[in-house]
């Protein structure tokens, strides 16, 4: 499928190793106190959630505690065998959009792979003030995307700060529920999940425990598929434009049984025809979506992770989806023979994390995404993706796990009837660390 990128900024860009070492060195000088090691446990969670501004007495008490810096991360090895084939830039993940659109598109079947690209390094800062606690996070990993796809290189995950009800920087979109992500060793995750770290300005006017309401202005972006009209001169000077930020919001209710979250988003996408020919291909589309998600505790130790999302023109917020806008034929209008259409989609996630005991866990489940393609897209355009896995992981200590996982993915094309699938067996080992400096 040939695709024209309008704007699709990747979540983060490579960071030079010297910059990371400089950051750590400065932190050691600025933050007083004695270092103390801590058991990191499982994967460090997402960026800190926004908190309401504390009362003056609480702020003063926290100020007495002094500033603290947490340095954390993990080293992780992935080794596996892929029985089929996919885009070699995505050799170590299961992404249905990167599976072949026609027979043997990426060569012969059967590939062994190994890497450390999931390895991560992060720094969290906590500085008490009279106005409340300033929370910051800088987090990087080694998984290259965008121009660095397929490479082992530093990539920014989070660059985030917050004070009281207001947060700013790059972190999880409020349209997303990061707690839906399962305890797996496959890096990319469920194809039907909303998953996007985005630049944003966020306000959380209400929070009580893990329950909250938040609203954000987010960096816009989208991509388009020219489909059967790719390469036409008339389309060469059609340029995308985003006059407004994306507007997202979430409401989460948390209780002893787990939580339920409803999130929504609305966005404006425009494209301008700069050609002076007989056609006027300028247009616009409104993207929107609703994402209902939940964690449900079962027998006090197992967790069901569930979500369903529906909308149109929100593909760049999805974990694995192709384009936000497709071509629709409008041949009855000689001035505007084609128009752009925000593509509708539905995505589903259903996984079960099983915690057998302190040493053993398993995860099993399924995810899918389905696109309502436009009639101007090519026959081999991406239509539907499916994803499933099961694993058994062993924890010799809370900071270390290792174990195998079986992984499966499938791609279905729009009109030509072609399908391709992926089956893998992967083994991973992960070693967490955490060091706290300062505080009392």
Where are these regions (language model features)?
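Outer-membrane beta-barrel proteins
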Residues: 82-86, 147-149, 177-181, 222-227, ...
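Outer-membrane beta-barrel "beta-signal"
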Residues: 396, 420-440
């Amino acid at each position: 499928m040939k695709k024209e990128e309008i704007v699709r900024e990747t979540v983060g860009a490579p960071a030079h190793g010297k910059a990371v070492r400089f950051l750590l060195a400065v932190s050691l000088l600025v933050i007083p106190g004695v270092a103390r090691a801590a058991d990191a446990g499982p994967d460090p969670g997402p960026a800190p959630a926004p908190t309401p501004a504390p009362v003056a007495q609480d702020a003063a008490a926290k100020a007495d505690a002094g500033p603290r810096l947490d340095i954390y991360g993990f080293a992780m090895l992935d080794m596996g065998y892929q029985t089929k084939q996919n885009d070699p830039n995505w050799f170590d993940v299961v992404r249905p959009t990167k599976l072949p659109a026609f027979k043997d598109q990426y060569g012969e079947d059967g590939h062994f792979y190994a890497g450390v690209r999931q390895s991560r390094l992060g720094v969290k800062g906590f500085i008490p003030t009279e106005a409340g606690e300033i929370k910051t996070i800088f987090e990087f990993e080694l998984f290259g995307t965008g121009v660095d796809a397929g490479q082992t290189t530093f990539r920014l995950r989070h660059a985030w700060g917050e004070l009281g009800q207001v947060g700013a920087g790059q972190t999880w979109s409020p349209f997303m529920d990061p707690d839906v992500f399962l305890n797996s060793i496959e890096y990319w995750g469920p194809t039907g999940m909303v998953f996007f770290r985005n630049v944003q300005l966020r306000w959380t006017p209400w929070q009580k425990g893990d329950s909250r309401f938040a609203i954000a202005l987010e960096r816009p972006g989208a991509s388009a598929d020219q489909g059967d009209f790719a390469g036409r001169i008339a389309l060469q000077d059609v340029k995308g434009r985003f006059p407004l930020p994306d507007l997202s919001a979430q409401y989460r209710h948390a209780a002893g049984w787990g939580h339920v979250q409803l999130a929504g988003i609305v966005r404006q996408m425009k494209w301008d025809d700069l050609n002076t020919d007989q056609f006027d291909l300028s247009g616009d589309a409104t993207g929107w979506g609703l994402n209902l998600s939940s964690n449900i505790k079962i027998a006090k130790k197992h967790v069901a992770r569930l979500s369903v999302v529906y909308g149109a023109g929100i593909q760049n917020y999805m974990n694995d989806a192709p384009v936000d806008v497709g071509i629709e034929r409008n041949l009855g209008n000689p001035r505007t023979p084609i128009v752009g259409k925000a593509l509708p989609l539905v995505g589903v996630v259903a996984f079960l994390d099983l915690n057998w005991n302190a040493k053993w866990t398993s995860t099993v489940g399924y995810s899918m995404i389905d696109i309502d393609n436009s009639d101007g897209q090519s026959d081999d355009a991406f239509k539907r993706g499916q994803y499933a896995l099961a694993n058994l992981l062993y924890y010799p200590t809370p900071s270390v796990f290792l174990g195998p996982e079986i992984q499966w993915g499938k791609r279905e094309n729009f009109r030509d009837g072609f399908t391709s699938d992926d089956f893998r067996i992967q083994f991973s080992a992960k070693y967490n660390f955490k060091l706290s400096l300062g505080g009392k």
